[in-house]
């Protein structure tokens, strides 16, 4: 059944969230609809934009209400994978020996009738055998899968069709650049060291063997800020080092962000494809002192009386994610000589990186 009567819409999708989510405000009835409020919690739903699915899942809540001047009916829900966030991880004995991340994921999500898709950049890691993996008591399915993804250095998200995706961001480019003074309605930047550390030290314990240990350095963090992480598995040297690199990489990517608002859910005005997570997009913003290719991490489609039809794009330095996938990007450039953009070109002598290694944003 198709539903109409939409008044306000917010749909969010992202590479760093296992489930998309939506919030809608609708009228009690609309043309051709005789029943009042036919949408109910627990119903299956597919949200499409011009027949293109952007979310496939379930209605979580309905919130009817009224006051002296108006009535309203709010509906919210998530992708099918939202159940993986809420529900406990259960599978036979709760232990796997020599299973791949894909096998573990399939075993955990099969009761929810969710398909597991492995992208091309994660093929090797998603199919590599994990010596031993256990469900921890009280752990949700998402927590269990996210722990496995950290161990293998990959990411998990959903694709708008209700499937669980194991992959890394690719290199597909957006058809439209983001240019200050042209199509950028608003831009909010965030450059933070709060969750970044100078060194990440991962420790593991293999039975009958000494502690496995690995480390990774964030060359931009110039003061002493160490972080010790206990490995999720019985880590040995190489896996502990990979886990440390994963932690550093993800924290760098999350520490440097900007949210760009554009007019329309589609690129090139209303004529191009939908804005989508995972696209590479050129950003030219003298105000932020950036002229570079960025990665769209999440997309929020909005429609309301105040803002009209707009799209919020959360973007990040793609090199942080490239370290995970093995892809190399060009360095970010400051749009003004002598100014400090995302990549200032300045390196602390104390943490000078070796030739061939990347430096990251500094503000």
Regions found by a protein language model. Give the residues of each.
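Envelope-exposed proteins and targeting segments
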Residues: 20, 43, 53-55, 71-73, ...
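Assembly/oligomerization scaffold segments
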Residues: 1-90, 151-153, 174, 179-187
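Short solvent-exposed strand/turn elements
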Residues: 70-89, 307-327
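Short, acidic/charged, Gly/Pro-enriched secondary-structure junctions
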Residues: 29-64, 95-111, 270-293, 297
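Beta-strand secondary-structure signal
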Residues: 21-25, 44-46, 74-76, 201, ...
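Flexible glycine-/small-residue-rich
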Residues: 26, 77-79, 168, 204, ...
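Acidic, small/polar-enriched beta strand-loop surface segments
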Residues: 146, 150, 155-306, 319-363
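Charged- and aromatic-enriched interaction segments used to assemble
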Residues: 69-192, 358-363
């Amino acid at each position: 059944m198709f539903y109409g009567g939409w008044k306000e819409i917010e749909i969010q999708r992202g590479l760093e969230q296992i489930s998309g989510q939506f919030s809608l405000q609708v009228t009690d009835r609309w043309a051709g609809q005789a029943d009042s409020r036919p949408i109910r919690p627990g119903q299956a739903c597919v949200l499409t934009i011009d027949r293109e699915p952007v979310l496939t899942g379930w209605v979580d809540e309905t919130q009817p209400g009224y006051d002296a001047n108006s009535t309203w009916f709010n509906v919210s829900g998530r992708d099918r994978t939202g159940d993986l966030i809420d529900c406990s991880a259960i599978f036979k004995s709760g232990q796997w020996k020599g299973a791949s991340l894909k096998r573990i994921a399939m075993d955990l999500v099969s009761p929810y009738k969710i398909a597991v898709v492995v992208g091309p950049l994660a093929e090797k890691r998603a199919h590599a055998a994990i010596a031993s993996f256990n469900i921890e008591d009280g752990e949700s399915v998402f927590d269990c899968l996210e722990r496995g993804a950290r161990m293998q250095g990959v990411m998990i998200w959903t694709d708008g069709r209700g499937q669980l995706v194991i992959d890394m961001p690719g290199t597909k480019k957006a058809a439209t650049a983001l240019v200050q003074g042209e199509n950028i309605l608003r831009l909010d930047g965030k450059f933070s060291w709060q969750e970044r550390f100078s060194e990440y030290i991962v420790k593991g314990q293999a039975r009958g063997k000494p502690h496995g240990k690995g480390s990774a350095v964030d060359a931009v963090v110039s003061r002493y800020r160490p972080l010790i992480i206990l490995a999720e598995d019985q880590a040995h040297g190489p896996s502990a080092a990979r886990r440390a690199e994963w932690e550093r990489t993800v924290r760098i990517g999350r520490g440097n962000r900007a949210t760009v608002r554009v007019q329309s859910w589609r690129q090139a005005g209303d004529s191009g494809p939908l804005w989508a997570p995972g696209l590479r997009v050129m950003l030219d913003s003298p105000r932020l002192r950036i002229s570079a290719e960025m990665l769209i991490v999440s997309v929020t489609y909005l429609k309301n009386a105040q803002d009209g039809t707009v799209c919020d794009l959360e973007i990040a330095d793609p090199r942080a994610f490239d370290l995970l996938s093995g892809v190399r990007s060009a360095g970010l450039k400051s749009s003004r000589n002598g100014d400090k953009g995302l990549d200032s070109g300045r390196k602390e002598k104390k943490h000078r990186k070796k030739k061939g290694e990347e430096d990251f944003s500094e503000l």
